[in-house]
Amino acid sequence: MASPSRRLQTKPVITCLKSVLLIYTFIFWITGVILLAVGIWGKVSLENYFSLLNEKATNVPFVLIGTGTVIILLGTFGCFATCRTSAWMLKLYAMFLTLIFLVELVAAIVGFVFRHEIKNSFKSNYENALKEYNSTGDYRSEAVDKIQSTLHCCGVTNYGDWKGTNYYSETGFPKSCCKLEGCYPQRDADKVNEEGCFIKVMTTIESEMGVVAGISFGVACFQLIGIFLAYCLSRAITNNQYEIV
């Protein structure tokens, strides 16, 4: 058993570690809320783009929402473990932080590896959406209209892509291709945007996903601090047989 003097010397160290870990855990909890918000924002703001991507890509917002929720719950547990100054709970907290970090690392690697597949998938699906486009508006046709009107573009690579579609042969260009709102372009190429949507969509997705990736990377690195603090506090409590109830 540690001597009284040793325990008196250790008490300030444990108190300091406990205070720092509580501050960290609160910030960590906030990052969970941020990830949850980013996931919801991504689902809403990128919904039109995701509807033309493969199933793997559409899961990205749900992964962020799920991760944010787990972090919120884990942060609550970490706060409780720190307040209780429980060595085994702090070890469990550090273990969970490590698992989440590894999952985020694997997800980042997978996302980087399959980024070209996402681009190819979008281009292929967008081309098919143009071929099957109809004015009554299934979800893919609505997505095409939303993208073209929002990004002021027409077709995949340029407006000429529409000329090979059934819709063009029957009606002409869709209204979403118009340069000016409320026009009826029919087959008049002067009334529609010339630039295609593929490059613009990829630029938008890369920009938006860059924000998501940056936040996710920051959260992942931040977890390393928590792992270190939780481990140090747990070890200090165990080695010195000191427990605060």
UniProtKB/Swiss-Prot annotation:
UniProt-listed SUPFAM superfamilies: Tetraspanin (SSF48652)
Residues carrying a glycan: N134
InterPro entries linked: Tetraspanin/Peripherin (IPR018499), Tetraspanin_animals (IPR000301), Tetraspanin_EC2_sf (IPR008952), TSN6/7_LEL (IPR048232)
Membrane-spanning segments: 20-40, 60-80, 94-114, 209-229
Species whose genome carries this gene: Mus musculus
Topology with respect to the bilayer: Multi-pass membrane protein
Top-level lineage group: Eukaryota
Cytoplasmic side: 1-19, 81-93, 230-245
Protein name: Tetraspanin-6
Compartments reported by the entry: Membrane
One Pfam match: Tetraspanin
Membrane side Extracellular: residue ranges: 41-59, 115-208
Family note: Belongs to the tetraspanin (TM4SF) family.
GO cellular component: membrane
Keyword terms of this UniProt record: Glycoprotein, Membrane, Transmembrane, Transmembrane helix
